[in-house]
């Protein structure tokens, strides 16, 4: 478990970024607080006829740049502090990608594994009824997150439409929906696809001709880990030499086939014991001699204890918060190029934005168009951050914060909310 209070960490990161830029004291004070916090009580009738009461949150952190955007988490240990921190990080993520959004996040304290599908539907609809007054396609646009999925988004969108008595434009009230009701092509692969573009550009700035034959190790084999393995091997010719899940990892210096490993994981519950590969631990995977390391699982896996042993030349943070602040310093001193999480994994929110644009306009794009537009967005964001890091001689995470906070600050100045 993470020991520190998540929102305290978010505020410290903001204060650190402020050292590298010109920002007024009042603006910094403003940015340390969410603009709106909503806490709701949701009564849900259970299948046995009893009623259970759940607590839900929606935090709209900052809307200077546009409607707030962010996922809805269902977690038994959800806290308001976590939701506030994640809403702050969404604010910086949408800003670094230059999307016309602010940041938001939602959560319900619930163990979804203990609910039937009917109970989940009633909870989803109850949550929308409770927060209806503070969301709209032009005010706050939720999306799936931990333990929520396209089906839950579909129920939520349907409930919103039922209350609003509106049809098509209300598709844009929520993203991450099934394709049949306004979802976007390319959403499933979006996080990994976006990360692949940043890895490609990182290789260029390191002077590599291309990625063909280069090696990558991926910690985590969920949606993002699997798609990243598939894309890096099939589209870029990289060798995926190691992957892992929560039970352990596998290594094969000749490379692993992404689809075969996924099939094995589905049949056996883990990637472990995959034929032709050697079993390794998650800790060993991180310290392999590879060109690219992609932590795509949980937070705080590269710490001051193991940062010195990292041998990769590029660390692509596909997961949220996989590297601690102390480890950041060590990797920077070692000359390792880090692609910080809220740049590296921003493909997801960017394609969510594309979904919203398609909903609002009623014009839908091909998969090729989605990928091409994502490529342009990710590449521009990468160089915005990389050039700032070079110019100020700071590491990539600090640079990403500087780029993002500067954009939010500028919007606040232009609106007259704060002064220079």
UniProtKB/Swiss-Prot annotation:
SUPFAM superfamilies: Aminoacid dehydrogenase-like, N-terminal domain (SSF53223), NAD(P)-binding Rossmann-fold domains (SSF51735). It is an enzyme of class 1 (oxidoreductase). GO terms for cellular component: cytoplasm. NAD(+) binds at residues 220-226. GO terms for biological process: glutamate catabolic process. It is found in: Cytoplasm. It comes from the Archaea. Homohexamer. This is Glutamate dehydrogenase. It comes from Pyrococcus abyssi (strain GE5 / Orsay). The gene is gdhA.
